[in-house]
């Protein structure tokens, strides 16, 4: 079998983490089998679909490394195909025009609710006579088109994740609406219908999507049969849950891929984490995967049925591993946009070699790329604010004299090197007859504003290169 899969997001919002995880599983399955990964944009909801969301979806997939082989195909450009399919079902007597009003449907639901029954359409317009239909039209009623569902029919399929699945037609809520009211005789085709037409037309072999689509699958199998088409294999993957076990939603904070990027997650770290959201590798001790490596191992036998809890701590850890193993030049490229977004100026001697030195200093401490913004602030501002501990340090006996001695020693240096910096510290310790700790703490506070921070000597060298060490030493002396 030639494997052909698709990811089919709706451009009614930015690329969601759940959609992205589904895309990951589709991509992995396609690559594992040497198949084709197709991008289809399901934009039949013309009122809510936006081109900016389409762009966000495509940009997000590319950023994650999920490049597609065919597409993007837009449902809004395929309406003729869907309308012909609706007409075919009408002509075959498998679908009909339903003129039931919204008020009548609401009354039906209320009556069923009062009896403790599940809401369902009662198929009242399935057998309208031409005269009845003409009367409804004369009343100005609009229609929807419904596909006939046999209540006695049992729908069975072997789900690649969940095993045997079985639904009865009576569980599907009555005859299914496949097109809503519009100006033409075939209506405006709806999601559950058009996805089947697309999957048939694109020869999709496997439909891989979230478990919240299981009820849709039962309905769609009936549509495949109505068109005499081959039914694809289905794999319904677990939902992504929050740590309390509820479906991950906007109430839990960030849910779109562009937000994760803005928060400082790397594409590699995020896609690695999504790969493990519901799938277990053969080697349970292996947690770091490239997409290509995961594709070699990916099977649905190792996809869990239970929901996958979204663990921020695990994502942070994975992300940090990718950051720590990214070469300095590449990491610099990743960090520059975050510095620019924070308004940091890269002028004043902050050239590429200087930036790479800064990245080398900070990289081991980064969990997210955004961490570099706060950690590096002292290297992009003319002055620093003293912390409470820093202020106390500068008031200690001997701090002012130590800083004055460092300034004097700096005047003898044409260029500060690591060796020269170490020599100055030794010279001040000896000359002032103080402990090295006092010198190091006083110097750190003067340069960084705090008693804690990145490597002191490397920080000093970076500040010296852009001419900020002496002004800060003088400012610290003034308040000591």
UniProtKB/Swiss-Prot annotation:
Binding site for ATP: 250
Gene name of the record: gltX
Record's protein name: Glutamate--tRNA ligase
Naturally occurring in which organism (per UniProt): Nostoc sp. (strain PCC 7120 / SAG 25.82 / UTEX 2576)
Motif extent ('KMSKS' region): 247-251
Function: Catalyzes the attachment of glutamate to tRNA(Glu) in a two-step reaction: glutamate is first activated by ATP to form Glu-AMP and then transferred to the acceptor end of tRNA(Glu).
Motif residue range(s): 'HIGH' region: 9-19
HAMAP family: Glu_tRNA_synth_type1 (MF_00022)
Keyword ATP-binding appears in the UniProt entry: yes
Main location: cytoplasm
GO BP terms: glutamyl-tRNA aminoacylation
InterPro entries reported in the protein's UniProt record: aa-tRNA-synth_I_cd-bd, aa-tRNA-synth_I_codon-bd_sub2, aa-tRNA-synth_I_CS, aa_tRNA-synth_I_cd-bd_sf, Glu-tRNA-ligase_bac/mito, Glu-tRNA-synth_I_codon-bd_sub1, Glu/Gln-tRNA-synth, Glu/Gln-tRNA-synth_Ib_cat-dom
